[in-house]
């Protein structure tokens, strides 16, 4: 699974409960986008979560 290159956010695991309260393991996956960003003056392709994109932690290359 992919992780955010900025904040390190990755998938989380937990339980999905049925109505009768039986458990099965499930995953919550972060919303990761492939983005061209400027790092040290050069455009680089990064995997970034949408929370970091909205917060402006990445300067996108046009």
From Swiss-Prot:
Gene3D superfamilies, per database record: Ribosomal protein L28/L24
InterPro entries per the UniProt record, alphabetical: Bacterial_rp_bL28 (IPR050096), Ribosomal_bL28 (IPR026569), Ribosomal_bL28/bL31-like_sf (IPR034704), Ribosomal_bL28_bact-type (IPR001383), Ribosomal_bL28_sf (IPR037147)
An annotated GO cellular component: ribosome
The UniProt record lists the keyword Ribosomal protein: yes
Keywords: Ribonucleoprotein, Ribosomal protein
SUPFAM superfamilies referenced in this protein's UniProt entry, alphabetically: L28p-like (SSF143800)
Entry keyword Ribonucleoprotein: yes
GO biological process, one term: translation
GO molecular function: structural constituent of ribosome
Superkingdom of the organism of origin: Bacteria
HAMAP family recorded: Ribosomal_bL28
Stated family: Belongs to the bacterial ribosomal protein bL28 family.
Protein name: Large ribosomal subunit protein bL28
Organism the protein comes from: Thermoanaerobacter sp. (strain X514)
